[in-house]
Every structure is written in C-alpha cells, then in structure tokens.
C-alpha cells in the first residue's frame, strides 16, 4: 500500500455501510481520518454499524440527517447504490464537498496498476476471463470490485508487480476523481438503470468516466460494433484498441477465418473455445485484447479458452433431466442479456422470465422468441411479458406467483430435446435479495424435479 497522508485528521463521511462502506471506513480510520459513518438502517438492526462503532468510529444510523455536513466534512465516500438525488448528497454537492465511491480510495492507495472493465452486459464474464488469462500468463492478477473482495481491501495488499482487475458499474464510476486504469475496457451500452440515471445519455456519460483520467500511456479497449461506445470513446486520451465480431480490424481484435486475431496475428481457433453463445465472443475478444496488451502469450490465452465454461448465473448449465437441458441465466437483469441468451440456442426453448418492474415494455424481445415454444412468467413484470408473448404469437403462455412454480410449469410444457432457460430480463429485487439468490432457488427447484 502506498503511503497516503491526504486523509490524516480529516473528517470524512462514509455514507451507506454494506461491504464497501465497511471496508472504506476501516481503511480511512487506518489512514488517520476521523470517520463518521452514516446508514439508513437503525443501529439495533445493523451489525456492521455496531462493529464500526466498537472500533471507535462515530456512527449515525436510522436516516441521513443533513446536520452531518456541518461537521467540517472534507470528503463523502458513498455506497454506489445511494442515488445522487438523496438530499444529503444534494446538499454535499451544493457545499462543493467531493463525493467519491470506494473504488476511488482503492486506486489512491494501490501500488498495482488497475484494469477496469465496464459495460451494460458481459462485465463479469470478461473480468473473470481477463483474470484467468493473466493468471495463466503469470502476470499476477488480483480480482476486486463487484466480484470477490472489495477493491480497497484488495488494494491494500496489492504489490507493484501485480494487476488489479476490477468490474465497474456506472454507479461506481460516477464517484471517481483521480481513478486512472492502465487499461479501460468499455464493452457495450444500452438503455438501463434509468431509475438511477434518468436518461441513456447520462448513463453512458457515467460509464465513460472510466476514461476520465487516462493519458496517451494508457489503453482503451473499445467495442467497434457499438455506435454508442464508439462515440463515448472520444472522452479517452488513451491508445484505442478496437474489437469487433463483424469486421476485420488490423490494429485490434477480430474474428477471421474461424479464428480470433489480435493485431493481425492468429491467437486461437473458434472451435477451441468451449464458452457457449455468440455474445461471449465479444467478451472473449475484449479479455484477449487486455491480456495481449499485458504480454500474455497466445498459448496461455488458448489454454484458458479451452477450459473456461462460464460464470455462475450467466448462461450456466445446471443439469439434464429426461433429455431436457436446464440453464441458469439469472444474471440476465435486462432485455439485452436475455436477447443474447435466447440467441445462444437453436433448440426449442421454454423461457422463464420476470422480475422487478422498472417501467419498460418487452416488445424488443419479440424477434428473439423464434425458438421459444412456451414462456412462464413471474414477478412484477409478468403481465408485460405476457403481452409481449401474445404479440409474438406464442401458443403456450403461463403466469405463476413463484419461481418454484415456474420451474414445475416449464418442465410440464417441455418435451424431449428442449432447453429450459431461466433468463428473467429483469432485476430480482421484487422477490429476491440478489440475482444470485434467484439463480440458487432456480437450481434447487430444478433438482427437486429429479
């Protein structure tokens, strides 16, 4: 960890605890700050807040009183999930108090360079692929952020010869000031999180913060097939490395003659890749570009792609029952992810979908229903998905209350050779704490059929 003195004796407000807030508060106390911790949950129900209080921190729970800003606050470190419309953040902005997220702290203390990966879909798969390729290539990667350990915990132990690989959301990237990844990858962009950002434009600009501090000594890995990403890459001063699944790119990564190429050099045959889905070729090209820029050999990249079958809850194969294959794609929290999941299969498919209603309709899914023989909907969006399925002309459409019921119904509507796919196209928070919980419940329900 770098020697950092900028926080000593400063009053710093950590807003929202959870994992990242707890880690940030603990780090800041170690760095000599006077830490004030604030969380909306009452102290009596807040185990992490009680632990921080026991460490000697000033803890205020049960709301976000504006009076906290009268304590000569030098910096606010916010939980990514707390919107900037929260009155205490609005007031902090008016007072010109800097507002950052925990990843900014991680960057400031880290001896190791960062690789940052963002996009609407594919972040986790690309991050894991990058980590595995760098590990196989003996580049000493450590993984942080939304996957695994909180970034500022990882950064404390990261050494100069290591690489911190981190998946970054738009929420995290809105709160960066100095964060400067050696390599920044922007995978794709489509309309999402409008309840937080308001418009697609603002969402895209938040993502583009990944380029904010890059210089000509850094690299920006860009999806050349995404017009929005290409436009936002104008914010990067780094060396641009493009990737594409649709056209040849001499100075970047592409697919040619059934092989993946980087800067006109063949790296791996497509037939050697075991990860399913056309969309995953985009993720692979991005990860391969990062790995090649950091000096990983073609042999190491190929070795990873011959064994990497995917990430849990992302088009995860579960089991086969009576020649029906079950797949868990609970991470599909938006339509684009479900479109890509449906495109991965040519077999007749029974789709399970539904979840939190964020105000959108589902007509964009209709062209992807060509192999869908039945749909079972659940959650808040069930009526909207039923409408889309009816417009698509599906014969078998069911709505149920729970995911357990959906699995039973889906199996009943399937026949020999079918795929049964959970790909909700919605966030999970109407019925589940996380998409991981939703996926685990799906897997448990599937195994009950055996």
UniProtKB/Swiss-Prot annotation:
Q: What is its main location?
A: cytoplasm
* Signal peptide (residue range): none
The processes (GO biological process) annotated in the record are: cell division; cell wall organization; peptidoglycan biosynthetic process; regulation of cell shape
**Which keywords, in A-to-Z order, does the entry hold?**
ATP-binding, Cell cycle, Cell division, Cell shape, Cell wall biogenesis/degradation, Cytoplasm, Ligase, Nucleotide-binding, Peptidoglycan synthesis
An example of a GO molecular function for this protein is: UDP-N-acetylmuramoylalanine-D-glutamate ligase activity
Supply the Pfam families for this chain. Answer: Mur_ligase_C (PF02875), Mur_ligase_M (PF08245), MurD-like_N (PF21799)
Instruction: Give the InterPro entries listed for this entry.
Output: Mur-like_cat_sf, Mur_ligase_C, Mur_ligase_C_dom_sf, Mur_ligase_cen, MurD
Which residues bind ATP per the record? 119-125
Gene3D superfamilies cross-referenced by the UniProt entry? Mur ligase, C-terminal domain, Mur-like, catalytic domain, NAD(P)-binding Rossmann-like Domain
Q: SUPFAM superfamilies attached here? A: MurCD N-terminal domain, MurD-like peptide ligases, catalytic domain, MurD-like peptide ligases, peptide-binding domain
Return the EC number: 6.3.2.9
Its pathway? Cell wall biogenesis; peptidoglycan biosynthesis
Q: Indicate where this protein resides in the cell.
A: Cytoplasm
> Is the Transcription regulation keyword given for this protein?
no
Q: What does this protein do?
A: Cell wall formation. Catalyzes the addition of glutamate to the nucleotide precursor UDP-N-acetylmuramoyl-L-alanine (UMA).
Family assignment?
Belongs to the MurCDEF family.
PANTHER family on file: UDP-N-ACETYLMURAMOYLALANINE--D-GLUTAMATE LIGASE (PTHR43692:SF1)
Protein name from the UniProt record: UDP-N-acetylmuramoylalanine--D-glutamate ligase
Source organism of this protein record = Bacillus anthracis
Question: Which gene name belongs to this protein?
Answer: murD
């Amino acid at each position: 960890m770098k020697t950092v003195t900028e926080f000593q004796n400063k009053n710093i407000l950590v807003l929202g605890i959870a994992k990242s807030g707890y880690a940030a508060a603990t780090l800041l106390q170690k760095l000599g700050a006077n830490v004030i911790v604030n969380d909306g949950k009452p102290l009596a129900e807040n185990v992490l807040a009680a632990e921080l209080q026991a460490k000697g921190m000033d803890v205020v729970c049960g709301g976000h009183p504006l009076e906290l800003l009268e304590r000569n606050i030098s910096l606010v470190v916010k939980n990514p999930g707390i919107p900037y419309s929260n009155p205490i953040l609005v007031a902090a902005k008016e007072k010109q108090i800097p507002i950052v997220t925990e990843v900014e702290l991680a960057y400031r203390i880290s001896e190791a360079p960062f690789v940052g990966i963002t996009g609407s879909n594919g972040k986790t798969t690309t991050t894991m692929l990058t980590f595995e390729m760098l590990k196989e290539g003996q580049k000493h990667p450590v993984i942080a952020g939304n996957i695994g350990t909180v970034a500022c915990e990882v950064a404390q132990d990261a050494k100069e010869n290591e690489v911190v690989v981190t998946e970054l959301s738009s929420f995290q990237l809105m709160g960066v000031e100095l964060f400067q990844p050696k390599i920044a990858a922007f995978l794709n962009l489509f309309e999402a999180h409008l309840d937080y950002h308001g418009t697609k434009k603002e969402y895209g600009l938040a993502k583009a913060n990944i380029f904010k501090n890059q210089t000509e000594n850094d690299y920006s890995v860009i999806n050349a097939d995404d017009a929005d990403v290409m436009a936002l890459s104008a914010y990067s001063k780094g060396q641009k490395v493009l990737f594409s699944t649709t056209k040849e790119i001499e100075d970047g990564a592409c697919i040619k003659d059934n092989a993946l190429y980087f800067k006109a050099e063949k790296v791996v045959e497509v037939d050697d890749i075991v990860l399913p889905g056309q969309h995953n070729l985009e993720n692979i090209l991005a990860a391969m570009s990062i790995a090649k820029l950091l000096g990983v050999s073609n042999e190491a990249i190929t070795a990873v792609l011959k064994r990497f079958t995917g990430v849990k809850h992302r088009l995860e194969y579960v089991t086969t029952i009576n020649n029906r294959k079950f797949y868990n794609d609970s991470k599909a929290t938006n339509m684009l992810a479900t479109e890509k999941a449906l495109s991965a299969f040519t077999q007749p498919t029974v789709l399970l979908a539904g979840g939190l209603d964020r105000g959108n309709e589902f007509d964009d899914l209709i062209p992807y229903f060509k192999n869908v023989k039945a749909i079972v909907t659940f959650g808040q969006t069930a009526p909207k998905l039923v409408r889309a399925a009816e417009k698509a002309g599906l014969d078998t459409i069911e709505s149920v209350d729970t995911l357990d019921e959906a699995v039973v119904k889906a199996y009943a509507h399937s026949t020999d050779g079918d795929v049964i796919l959970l790909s909700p196209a919605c966030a999970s928070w109407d019925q589940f704490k996380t998409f991981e919980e939703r996926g685990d419940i799906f897997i448990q329900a599937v195994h009950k059929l055996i």
